C-alpha cells in the first residue's frame, strides 16, 4: 500500500508551496515489522518495485510459503510486480474490491505513523520528512512495543520466537 504525506517549502519567490512525499512499505504480518520501504516524491512504479525487491531479498531464506498482500492499487497490478512475485515463487494476495478491512494491518501502521510522527508537526523539506519517516520506522521496528506481541517490539518478537 502507498500513503501520502505533505510538507511545505518556500519557492524561489518566497511563496509557501505544498509538496508531497509517498511511502511504499512492506510489512511482515507475523510480527508487524516493516521489512522494506521506499520513499519518493511522486507515486511511481520504481518506488513500489524497489520496496518489493528489498522485501523479496529480505525474505529469500524463509522456510515458509511467502505471500505478499496488498490493496488493489495500480502499482500492485503491474505486470512487472506480478512477474517478480512469480519468479520468486511468492503468492500474491489482494484485498477484495471495496473491502478496506482486508488491508487493515497496513492501514493501522499508517494511522500509528501519522498519529505519532506526522500530525501536529510541520515539515519544511522533502529530506526532513524523509529522514523523520526513516527514523520512525526504525523506532517502530525496534523500540515500539505492542500488546499483541507480548509487549515486545516487532524485531524483539521475531528474535524471541525464532530463538525458541
Per-region residue spans from a language model:
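Charged DNA-binding/catalytic regions of mobile-element recombinases
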Residues: 1-164
